[in-house]
A protein has these predicted regions:
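DNA-dependent DNA polymerase catalytic subunits
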Residues: 1-287
Length: 287
């Protein structure tokens, strides 16, 4: 900690000195002022980052993020608990292994339905008019609630709380998103089951894939550890084919994220799907 504080203090001192030196060259009202620094700092892409922000006091910092899921209101709190939790571990302990253990334990807990229902609630504002109301899930739910009980149904500008629920869906009969969500009170009263898989695949998984794809080579079970140039070679092959660096960069990201999904998420997705289908795993038979 002392070494880290010394490094941070050095950066503050240099920044403040440069600010003072530049000020001699600038005419008022121009001012080049030392402002802040991040350590550690995770950059996902332009205007998408998270890190610990320091200003003048190296003993004080606050976590600051931009453009990532922790800033979005249309996610359930479970995203902040799991994704926010592993971000905290990485930033404050700089321990990827511990963050992976936390992720594994959290996904297992979620797959087993061990989190309180309130952590799964999503809320969205109900507008007075929608061009395509059947495509707006919480509008479909609000209309359904109005049919059940007009007196307690959400009104325009209300925040509508809902939970994703397990529903039977076939290839022939695809359900609207509005038929896959339900009012939390109604869910409890009618003993409905939350769709834990949806929270994993549609809210938690994507940001985690983006994060861990940066350290794919360090993940347990990664199958190309002995081939140090595999991604470099894939990049060359794709670039020869597509002739577009941006498209190739995107494709490499997708491929790396797919490998992370297989390593970290596939067993939980399979576990939930098997539960829905009534298929038991070998561990269910162990006493």
């Amino acid at each position: 900690d002392n070494e880290k504080d010394n490094i941070l203090q050095y950066n503050v001192n240099v920044g403040e000195k440069l600010s003072a030196d530049f000020q001699k060259l600038l005419k008022p009202p121009h001012c080049l002022e030392w402002e802040k620094m991040f350590y550690p700092f995770i950059i996902f892409s332009k205007k998408r980052y998270v890190g610990n922000l320091y200003e003048h006091d190296v003993k004080k910092f606050k976590q600051k993020s931009m453009g990532i899921v922790l800033k979005r209101r249309d996610n359930a709190n479970i995203v902040k608990i799991i994704y926010g939790g592993l971000i905290n571990i990485i930033l404050n302990k700089q321990d990827i292994t511990e963050s992976l253990k936390f992720l594994d334990e959290s996904l297992n807990k979620l797959a087993n339905g061990e989190y309180p229902l309130e952590e799964l609630i999503v809320t969205k504002t109900l507008r007075g008019f929608y061009k395509n109301p059947l495509q707006i899930a919480h509008k479909v739910l609000a209309d359904r609630m109005k049919k059940r009980d007009p007196g307690s149904a959400p009104q325009s500008n209300d925040r509508v709380p809902y939970v994703y629920i397990q529903v039977k869906e076939t290839k022939k009969k695809k359900l609207l998103q509005g038929n896959k969500i339900e009012d939390p009170k109604y869910l409890i009263q009618n003993n409905l089951t939350p769709d834990y898989g949806h929270y994993i695949t549609n809210q938690i998984m994507k940001p985690c894939l983006q994060l861990y794809s940066m350290v794919l080579e360090d993940l347990k079970g990664y199958k190309h550890k002995n081939d140090k140039k595999i991604w470099q070679n894939k990049y060359k092959i794709l670039l020869e084919d597509k002739k577009d660096k941006i498209k190739v960069d995107d494709k490499i990201k997708q491929l790396r994220e797919k490998e992370v999904e297989e390593l970290l998420f596939s067993k939980y997705i399979n576990k939930i799907e098997n539960k829905k289908s009534g298929i038991k795993s070998m561990t269910d038979f162990l006493i």
